[in-house]
Amino acid sequence: MAGASRYAVYLKPAAERALKKVKDDTARRRIVKAIDGLTTNPRPPGAVAIQGGDGLLRIRAGDYRMLYTVDDDALAVLVVTIGHRRDVYQR
């Protein structure tokens, strides 16, 4: 059996800005670890499809949520936004 496929992970500019705004170092590390995990498993346990999100998935990292899409043909993950759980869905 061949090695596991690795997905390339891309962040939209808004997601990059949101990640930089996370002031809590522990939370930021948790988010980065979750993003890194998407390279080997773009649909980890706990990933949930967003209703009405046109293919958007959500993963949790503490109090933060990441919304992203997966392109299996291109082996790519696009992180659309990162935000605190209280306001990430309001966009």
Residue locations for each model-derived region?
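Basic, Lys/Arg-enriched alpha-helical interface segments
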Residues: M1-D63, D71-L78, R86-R91
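Residues forming the ATP-binding cleft of Hanks-type serine/threonine protein kinase domains
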Residues: G83
